[in-house]
C-alpha cells in the first residue's frame, strides 16, 4: 500500500471552490480504485492559510496507472475539475507518494 499525497496551493479567498471539489471528488476517487484517507484544509489560527492536502491510499504504484486512467475517463471527475478550474481557487497541485511508518 502506498499513499498518494496531493499538496494544493490555493487562493484563501476562494476556499469554497476547493472545499466543494474535495467534497465532490471523494466518490469518484473511491469508484476509480483509491481509498480516501482524507482531505485537509488549513485552520485560520496557525500555519499557512493557502495550503491543503489530500491523502489517497492506492494498493501499489503499478495500480496507480490504472487508477489515473479510470479517473481521467470519468465524466464526474471531468466536471469536478472544470468547476475547480472555473472557481479560480487552485494555484498549484503537487503529487508524491508517501509511505506509513508503522506505529509501535
Question: Where are the predicted features?
Answer:
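Intrinsic disorder/low-complexity detector
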Residues: 1-2, 46, 74, 86-104
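Short, well-ordered beta-strand segments in beta-rich or mixed alpha/beta enzyme
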Residues: 2-9, 40-72
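Short, surface-exposed ligand-recognition loops at beta-strand->loop->(often short) alpha-helix junctions
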Residues: 10-20
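Residues that cap or initiate secondary-structure elements
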Residues: 12-14, 60-62, 101
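An amphipathic, aromatic/His-enriched active-site/gating alpha helix that lines ligand/cofactor pockets
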Residues: 20-38, 57-95
